[in-house]
Amino acid sequence: MSNQERQERPEKDPDLRSTEVTEGYEKAPHRAMFRAMGYDDEDLSSPMIGVANPAADITPCNVHLDDVADAAYDGIDDTEGMPIEFGTITISDAISMGTEGMKASLISREIIADSVELVTFGERMDGIVTIGGCDKNMPGMMMAAIRTDLPSVFLYGGSIMPGEHDGREVTIQNVFEGVGAVADGEMSEGELDEMERHACPGAGSCGGMFTANTMASISEALGFAPLGSASPPAEHESRYEEARRAGELAVEVVQERRSPSDFLTRESFENAIALQVAVGGSTNAVLHLLALAAEAGIDLDIETFNEISARTPKIADLQPGGERVMNDLHEVGGVPVVLRALNDAGLLHGDALTVTGNTIAEELEQIDPPTVEDLDVDYLNTVEDPIHERGAIRILSGNLAPDGAVIKITGEDHLHHEGPVRVFEQEEGAMEYVQEGHVESGDVICIRNEGPQGGPGMREMLGVTSAVAGQGHAEDVALFTDGRFSGATRGFSIGHVAPEAFVGGPIAALEDGDTITIDIDDHELSVDLTEDEMQQRLEGHDPEPTYDSGVLAKYHNDFGSAANGAVTNPGAKWD
């Protein structure tokens, strides 16, 4: 073809970053590569929008995400965008739970964030739809969006429906607790086998207000996701409508140059915390919100969770503390119902902006979700007549946790416990102790060397806490650790004790028989040792890393304190 016959492509916005790989005769090789994948002139002249997809067959949370990503892709394509789908990793928290492999979970948050950042940076993308399924997908994707500051929309893959067993609804939480019930003689192995076969009927993230659903709900409160997008179940048609909507919105936010830094503020994070404590959300959200704030350079102290929990009541009775799941919330209007209740009571910053360009109050006005009073359901209470006067999250301190520790209150508010401690160096020893039937009412169990650096990776202890709960000790046995707990954990379980044992935190000084005081009302976690006694015990404390090569050794060196979100990005900022 002669020069005069050269085909003219539509003009592209010169301010788009993707012009670096699509415009000018010098980029002919780049365009040739795109054409090999089926992109045409119209595509190459459009905003290039990534679809970050962690689809995988290793967890029901993510097994359907190719279909979700396809719907988002179509939304971009039909709105004059150029969609480019790419993959990243996921770890199944539930399947790795109770094994050495659980150390990979929190590390995967960092790898997801890094990998999405790298692809969008390397390919000069203009915007991104980030998709999440299993627990660490959500914070990893949002961290990447904040770090790149690309116009971004977060899209949740949706939760699993509850199963049915013996005439009642069951979830994975019931199966984990069934393990403890079998060990205690309260359930037969045959009964557990039947429950196992019915608890997880299809695709989607764990159905209660566990970590995945907590972070998905928080994505709405932060402004990262459109209101109402978190609750549709994974296999409902409405989930794919939300995915298409996310793709369409992604084109809009690129065209409007609306980046996370344009709407994320401290008030956004305070809204997220208010929602978390009102619905009884996962303790993991404390860690992840601190990490997101650090990425955004927003000053968010762990004590803020206490301040907001003190003024925000718990109004949703969902698993693990209650019986209902995310689908129940979806059927009455989803997360916006809770947000409206909080906003109407003056407990939200209604003027906080969202990814749509509107404030959260304006979005609520447009959606007009029902009031809790109008719904009259047994799992949502009004702010004036709450389930608990205070929100579900407490931050404890004291001489055992000078930098803080986290507990979620799922039952009785006024918890006080004092007694001798039984110390375990890793999760496995504690699990064996519980499963062999040694645990008794009034026990205090400490599991240490499971922190961000010491594990490394802050394993979740759902196996241990579920075994304790399954034996009937959810409220009368206390457990604390420098590791984490699953969002499905309930009971007297305290995590994120900081500083951790590996770096010489006070938890490293404990010995069997030391008297521990836990007082939730006073936010106290302490031991009957003086500062001098603890320092004497810690003399010569210089533990070797658990791993000397590979990814676990790398992240042992990179992780920061749980009190700051256990971030690894050296550019992340905190006060």
Swiss-Prot record:
GO biological process: isoleucine biosynthetic process; L-valine biosynthetic process
Keywords: 2Fe-2S, Amino-acid biosynthesis, Branched-chain amino acid biosynthesis, Iron, Iron-sulfur, Lyase, Magnesium, Metal-binding
Region (Disordered): 1-27
Species annotation: Haloarcula marismortui (strain ATCC 43049 / DSM 3752 / JCM 8966 / VKM B-1809) (Halobacterium marismortui)
InterPro entries listed in its UniProt record: DHAD_IlvD/Edd, Dihydro-acid_dehy_C, DihydroxyA_deHydtase, DiOHA_6PGluconate_deHydtase_CS, ILV_EDD_C, ILV_EDD_N, IlvD/EDD_N
Subunit structure: Homodimer.
Catalytic activity: (2R)-2,3-dihydroxy-3-methylbutanoate = 3-methyl-2-oxobutanoate + H2O; (2R,3R)-2,3-dihydroxy-3-methylpentanoate = (S)-3-methyl-2-oxopentanoate + H2O
Family indicated by similarity: Belongs to the IlvD/Edd family.
Binding site for Mg(2+): D93, D135, K136, E460
Cofactor stoichiometry and binding remark: Binds 1 [2Fe-2S] cluster per subunit. This cluster acts as a Lewis acid cofactor.
Residue positions of the active site: S486 (proton acceptor)
Pathway the protein contributes to: Amino-acid biosynthesis; L-isoleucine biosynthesis; L-isoleucine from 2-oxobutanoate: step 3/4; Amino-acid biosynthesis; L-valine biosynthesis; L-valine from pyruvate: step 3/4
Protein name listed in UniProt: Dihydroxy-acid dehydratase
NCBIfam families: ilvD, PRK00911.1
Domain of life: Archaea
Keyword Cell inner membrane carried by entry: no
Residue numbers carrying N6-carboxylysine: K136
Binding site for [2Fe-2S] cluster: C61, C134, C206
E.C. number: 4.2.1.9
Transmembrane segments: none
Functional description taken from the UniProt entry: Functions in the biosynthesis of branched-chain amino acids. Catalyzes the dehydration of (2R,3R)-2,3-dihydroxy-3-methylpentanoate (2,3-dihydroxy-3-methylvalerate) into 2-oxo-3-methylpentanoate (2-oxo-3-methylvalerate) and of (2R)-2,3-dihydroxy-3-methylbutanoate (2,3-dihydroxyisovalerate) into 2-oxo-3-methylbutanoate (2-oxoisovalerate), the penultimate precursor to L-isoleucine and L-valine, respectively.
GO molecular function per UniProt: 2 iron, 2 sulfur cluster binding; dihydroxy-acid dehydratase activity; magnesium ion binding
